[in-house]
Amino acid sequence: MSRILVIGAGGVGVITALSLWLKKESDVSLVVRSDYDRVLKHGYTIESCDYGRLEGWRPHHIYSSVEDAASAADNQGYNYIVVTTKNIIDGPVNSRVSNIIRPVLEKNKELHGPQLTTHILLVQNGIDIEKEIWAEFPREQYRYTVLSGIQLIGSTKIGSGHISQVGQDHLSCGAFDPQDAAAIQAANDFVRMYSNEGQNFVEFDPRVRYSRWKKLLYNAAINTSTALVGLDVPRCLEFGVNKKSTEIEVFHPAMREIIAIAASEGIIIEEEFITMFTEITRKKVFKPSMCVDCEKGQLMELEVILGNPIRIAKRNGVATPTLSILYNLLVLVQAKLKERKGLLKFDEKTATLVDE
């Protein structure tokens, strides 16, 4: 039985742990930070469109930190690390994915050496998110694969230990390196362990990079715009200069720029997805993740969703006027959030940013 550690106990992470637990093909551990005491004592209250209402639910093991999960007396090593935290590469150093998973990789190496391959599944947004892992953990020192998880799920933590899931869980899982046979096998195994027939929808993804560029049509154009204005998508569409102005003047140009950047990388994204993403969000009164993060005063996944694609565009000579406006404005919003958290300091006497 595979041992799986899920890191991130928000709406996505808890439903991920629940789905694995219900399938009964893995031993599931969950890192629960802020809600640890509450969940340890009372478990989770979950209202799920896939699984119904659960009271007092817990996975097989819960830990208050990744370090505790790695150093637990009964830790025999984890076969899978599933990362569902936000990917904030411009945030505090200790929140970078490589630093989050390091204690587990180090412990696995100590316990098993080269005999255990750790499969790192990144259920996160953005493009080029795998490169940090490959850069920080040399293959000659660590034995691991890196897997991609692209999840569409309307799941939110609405209170301490309280999860609401309103959209069916759709997960596609594949290997970032399409030539890595071990990663491909691990992705297929995870699909099997995660699939609860008739409840969630899970599939193996043979074209990870294509899928990630495709999802960026939504994230880079729609998710970002809602964060700037603090509105759900239907209101963005209805509150425009006219009924078509937001999609025609903002959403669609941004999406076409993503298509052009992807094409410069040899990835062809069909134009029909522009209409598809607009239409499926038109009647969903649901605030996307960046909008929610901004309203909660939390840092947004700005760099992996907008920064990385724009850097690729500059490298490949692709014009991105709409994306660049969105990005530069959101950099200011992100800086405001950082200042409130004490991550940036502004000297009002000199009207300059203080270097630390």
UniProtKB/Swiss-Prot annotation:
Transmembrane segments: none
Annotated protein name in UniProt: Uncharacterized protein YDL144C
Domain of life: Eukaryota
InterPro entries: 6-PGluconate_DH-like_C_sf (IPR008927), 6PGD_dom2 (IPR013328), KPA_reductase (IPR013752), KPR-Related (IPR051402), KPR_N (IPR013332), NAD(P)-bd_dom_sf (IPR036291)
Residues of the signal peptide: none
Keywords annotated in UniProt: Cytoplasm, Nucleus
Subcellular locations according to the entry: Cytoplasm; Nucleus
GO CC terms, sorted: cytoplasm; nucleus
PANTHER family: 2-DEHYDROPANTOATE 2-REDUCTASE-RELATED (PTHR21708:SF30), PROBABLE 2-DEHYDROPANTOATE 2-REDUCTASE (PTHR21708)
Pfam family, one: ApbA
Coarse class of the protein's main subcellular location: cytoplasm
Other notes: Present with 5171 molecules/cell in log phase SD medium.
